[in-house]
Structure formats: structure tokens, C-alpha cells
């Protein structure tokens, strides 16, 4: 089952970098939204998740926070 995934991040965030490095190491292409460069992305993160916290993986529009939880999700549901 294919899910719609989007990673909300900030380039300077070490936890975001951890998730992006995991994605790169496993050849995962997930759309990224930089909340520092894209005010609309920041607004959506606040509106849907109720807070501005990154990294945040939206899974079919539902937010998942915390880098370790995101990596666990990716390794279980996305990695081949």
C-alpha cells in the first residue's frame, strides 16, 4: 500500500539531518519541505500538527515526530 509521505525539516536541524542521511543511505526519495524557506510549509505544520517541530514526517497527512520514530517507520514501511 503506497502512502503519501512528506518530510518537514530545517537544514540546520541535526535530527532532520539524521533522517535525511538515513533516506539518502537507503535511496529513499521523499518530498522535503523546508520550513525556514517555505512559510506555507511552516503554517501547514503548525495547523495540522498543532506545533512547529521538526523533523516531522507526514504520512497521508498525519504527522509523525522524533527522528528515531521516523527512521523506524521508514525502515519498516518504506525500505526495500
Per-region residue spans from a language model:
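GST-like domain detector, emphasizing the conserved glutathione-binding G-site
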Residues: 2-10, 17-80
